[in-house]
Regions:
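Glycine- and small/polar-enriched repetitive beta-structure motifs of secreted/surface proteins
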Residues: 1-176
């Protein structure tokens, strides 16, 4: 069944929260469901589940024609008229990974795919989970050392995006 949404601040146009608790949302076209203690400042973020996420920035969108339904009810709640119509609106190109927790996404079109990940800068994606071995320049390979110095104990901090079979382009940044 539905869990009531409680203790939320939702401001802006077209923002919705379903079964959410203690979220703060400001912007346009955001849609959160099943989330707890998330902060979203930006536009067109869609996220299902998760908790303790901080999102600052807007997602990339595209214009799409979507079908909606207008429903008129009488005082008793009985449907007396239902009419389908189409409208063109901005929709996000993608949704965030479901059930992500403790993530930080700062910048336009950023995303985190693993719990605890951090994505900083436009189009950055944090996709590497904890447990990944760091690169050892002395061997030109991932380190075999399993200490916390070489093996991550938390998800990655990303300032770019690696190319994957389903994505277009690599994004790199210089850290100075």
């Amino acid at each position: 069944g539905n869990t009531p949404s409680i203790n939320n601040t939702i401001n802006g146009y077209g923002n919705t929260g379903t079964n959410v608790e203690r979220i703060s949302m400001m912007g346009t076209g955001n849609n959160m469901s099943g989330s707890t203690a998330d902060v979203v400042i930006g536009d067109y973020h869609h996220m299902d589940g998760g908790k303790n996420n901080v999102i600052l920035g807007s997602m990339a969108t595209e214009k799409k024609t979507v079908e909606k339904t207008y429903t008129m009810k009488d005082a008793s709640g009985n449907v007396i008229l239902e009419k389908k119509y189409k409208v063109t609106e901005n929709v996000p190109i993608k949704s965030h990974t479901a059930n992500i927790s403790n993530a930080v996404m700062l910048g336009y079109n950023t995303d985190v795919e693993k719990d605890g990940g951090v994505a900083i800068g436009a189009d950055s994606v944090a996709s590497v989970d904890k447990g990944a071995a760091g690169y050892d320049p002395s061997t030109d390979m991932a380190s075999a050392d399993t200490s916390a110095t070489w093996k991550a104990t938390a998800a990655a901090v990303s300032v770019g995006k690696a190319a994957t079979p389903t994505s277009v382009g690599t994004i790199t940044r210089q850290i100075t």
